[in-house]
Curated annotation (Swiss-Prot):
GO biological process: methylation; ubiquinone biosynthetic process
Protein name: 2-methoxy-6-polyprenyl-1,4-benzoquinol methylase, mitochondrial
Pathway note: Cofactor biosynthesis; ubiquinone biosynthesis
Cited function: Methyltransferase required for the conversion of 2-decaprenyl-6-methoxy-1,4-benzoquinol (DDMQH2) to 2-decaprenyl-3-methyl-6-methoxy-1,4-benzoquinol (DMQH2).
Gene that produces this protein: coq5
The enzyme's E.C. designation: 2.1.1.201
Binding residue positions for S-adenosyl-L-methionine: T117, D143, N173, A174
């Protein structure tokens, strides 16, 4: 393991060890590259997958998911506030602080996938700059949806990172990432995005491919709530209240219904950790994950050794 990656891997392994639960890039930014890649490069028309609770052909899911996020792009923060009762902001801060970007003497290259609005990327750069004095670490924001990327690009103009060379927005499919070379990334992050992908094992395979040896994969995603009475209360809120809020916030109840259903269909933390391990990663700590807010969300971390 390189001298750069070893401290990061050790930090994450030590930082997550024993934690079961808690109360809870380089082109100029002015040119947002829309380099599109699609899973439709291969014929999947004979295979079915889930879109929320519905079964749909695999080659249709990508289009359906794109429509959802195009619909909610301008209200994305409000959507996350509704789905997490506002706690997603704290979760994201925890997520980034666990990674501690910029903690190396060598600038890092970080890939944030499904991060079109820039929310995680800006937090990463703020942490690297303000906590670690690192003004050279860069983030590539990759998202399949140009509407989400447009939101991120617009927001970047209000940050110190606009036109700085430290952040880049590109349109990429998480299952392909053909613009990202092998063994080129120090950290790979994905927040509230992987459950919307058609083939999660392919996403994990690509994450493993692009990471350097010693590189870190970290995923923040909704998970399974516990104990059972709280889980049922949260489920009732999700299925009865959230679609109504979707109508009020974005004039779109159907997109919110899908997002709730996608959470319900996503594997529990232990199962997802096994998927990460099966992709070749070494799980950080005892379990490879940390649950937040009684399991509403979880942080999963793996290391490419």
């Amino acid at each position: 393991m390189s001298r750069l990656r070893a401290p990061v891997a050790k930090f994450l392994a030590d930082g997550l060890k024993g934690i079961r639960s808690t109360a809870l890039a380089g082109s100029r930014l002015s040119n947002c590259r829309y380099t599109s890649t699609s899973s439709k490069d291969t014929d999947t028309s004979s295979h079915m997958t889930h879109f929320g609770f519905k079964d749909v052909p695999e080659d249709e899911k990508e289009h359906l998911v794109k429509n959802v996020f195009s619909s909610v792009a301008k209200k994305y923060d409000e959507m996350n506030d509704a789905m997490s009762l506002g706690i997603h902001r704290l979760w994201k801060n925890i997520f980034v602080s666990r990674l501690n970007p910029g903690n190396s003497t060598v600038p890092m290259k970080i890939l944030d996938v499904a991060g079109g609005t820039g929310d995680i990327a800006f937090r990463i750069l703020n942490h690297a700059t303000n906590h670690n004095g690192d003004r050279n670490t860069r983030v590539i924001v990759a998202d399949i949806n140009p509407d989400m990327l447009s939101v991120g690009l617009r927001r970047s103009k209000k940050t110190p990172y606009y036109d700085s060379g430290r952040v880049e927005f590109i349109e990429q499919n998480a299952e392909i990432l053909d613009k990202i070379p092998d063994n080129s990334i120090d950290m790979y992050t994905i927040a509230f995005g992987i459950r919307n992908c058609t083939h999660i094992p392919k996403v994990l395979e690509q994450a493993y491919r692009v990471l350097k040896p010693g590189g870190v994969f970290s995923c923040l995603e909704f998970s399974k709530v516990y104990p059972a009475p709280l889980a049922e209360l949260y489920r009732q809120y999700s299925f009865k209240i959230l679609p109504l809020l979707g109508t009020i916030i974005a004039g779109d109840s159907q997109s919110y219904e899908y997002l709730v259903e996608s959470i319900e269909r996503f594997p529990d933390a232990k199962t997802f950790a096994k998927m990460i391990e099966d992709a070749g990663f070494t799980l950080a700590g005892e379990t490879g994950y940390e649950t937040l807010s009684f399991g509403i969300a979880a942080i999963h971390t793996g290391i490419k050794l």
